[in-house]
Amino acid sequence: MSLITTLARLEAVESGRARPTATVRHRRLTDRPLVLVPLTTAGEAGAPLGALVGTDREAPRLLAVAQPRDRDLRFAFLAELAEAVLPHIESYADVVEPAERGETDPATGKRVKVETELCVDAAQIVVPSRAGVEFVRLLGRSMRFRRTAEDDPDTPYPAPARVPLLGRWLTHYGERARVPGSSLLLACTDLLNRHWATGQSSLEDQHLGALLAWIDPPAGESGAEAALRAELARDASGQLLCPPAGPATDPDFDNRLLAPAIEKYDRARASLAAAEDGLAADARLAELTGAEREIRALLAGVLRPTWDAVWRGLDLLRELPEGARAEDRWTRDRWSFTAHRDRVRSGEPPQPRRDDAVTAARKLAARETAQAQLEAQEALDDPLVLAGRRLAGEAFIGEVSAVEMAYSESKRPSPRPLVTVRTDERPQLGEGVKVYRSLDGKPQTAQFAGYGPADGDGGAPSLVLRITDRMGRGKEPAPGSVPEPGDRIAWTLFEHDQRGGPQLPDAEETPWTHGGPPGGLEAAELPDPVTPEDLL
């Protein structure tokens, strides 16, 4: 936690209202996000109970499983979910624009530009909390390997046709959510926590109702009071006025309302199966339909407050202007979306259960690079975030007091002007340390050359920086490429554009300890044989 965030939390406690930790919105919000509010069954890991899904805040689609332990009803739920989600995703897949990307020419080994297409936009999914993101990933893992009747006519429990496809998409979204700065799959609580600091703990910030109470409390009530009421207040029947954001449910709801309703449904279904004539069957069918409606009404009552809270959170976030570099991160999301669309359409198999060593290393390297890029871009977009880096000595703002032209000592001298900067801050500088500033949206590098004279009695010494790049190819610097006296500039000690690490070897050159050469991975996946020592 940065010092700025700590101060913001202290101010929130004192004022009774959440304090902003950002002046711009650092994540892209599309015009039509798909909001998904899921519920799971207590005691059944990953068993869906119900969901509200849709892009229209006034008309959500309710999906419910009357008996979560019934495999057929769970498959019916997944089929309904596919009908609700896949058309939204596919509506973005065919709207494309021409684009170029770099690829390695197999003949020459050089990087070349290749004409391709890029989806103009991508489908965005928003869930209430971080647990919802994990549930989406779990759903994808459980669905993408399902066999349909078309795949295998002899499979004992065939899945509906579109369920495996939805599983592949949800798996992709779940994996993409692990990339720092990605906006394909967002948790509302994480979004709000990124832009506001409350006076409660990070664990309490995962309660969507309490979080919104701190950010936008009712008139005449402090955030702490509103948050406490959101967490604990119950109605006359003992149910929470602000139900959990899911996917877990409140135990009192399970015990007092849901369990009796499911038992009633089970009895009605058993009675229908035992009916001996048509009249009795019609009566039992009416009872079964009524029991199912009761369960749907209970789930709707629990889900709707969370649904409204998610949209309220999105409204608060839309009041912030979008950060300048959020578009760049969204473009990478669009490339990811387009690439997965191409893999699905080309008939590639589903994502494997476990990544091989090379794929895992590439993912980790990409996420590390994305994390560094995100931290740098947020600081460049947001003065409040930059202030936190300045307090940590990782950036500083100073005024240029003098510029002295100098040149390198190479055979072809290049301009290396010395810029003297006055600042009251204490950046962590050492001899030869590189600093960076943004010049026309791209980084310009300078080296710390030493300290200059102090400004007045007892003042901090000035900093002397040597500009090293982005001044053109001429003997004299290009106009505007060198700061002028009086310019007030933000310098950072961190790079603005992170470079990737070294390339990993091909599969044929990968050591056997990491899955190669070809065929080694399959051998490594075989379990050890069971021996008598393994049995007690």
Give the location of each predicted region.
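A broadly tuned "polar low-complexity/structure-edge" signature
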Residues: 50-104, 184, 191, 195-196, ...
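Long, charged/polar, low-complexity intrinsically disordered N-terminal extensions
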Residues: 1-122, 135, 141-181, 185-188, ...
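Short, surface-exposed beta-strand/loop "edge" segments at domain boundaries and coil↔beta transitions
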Residues: 42-49, 58-62, 132-137, 426-431, ...
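C-terminal effector modules of nucleic-acid-centric enzymes and ribosome-associated factors
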Residues: 436-440, 444-536
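Conserved nucleotide-binding/hydrolysis modules and their immediate coupling elements
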Residues: 384-482
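Accessory interdomain/linker segments of ATP-dependent helicases and helicase-like nucleic-acid enzymes
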Residues: 7-10, 285-429
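Alpha-helical structural signal
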Residues: 114-128, 133-138, 142-346, 436, ...
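Structural motif
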Residues: 37-42, 67, 127-130, 424, ...
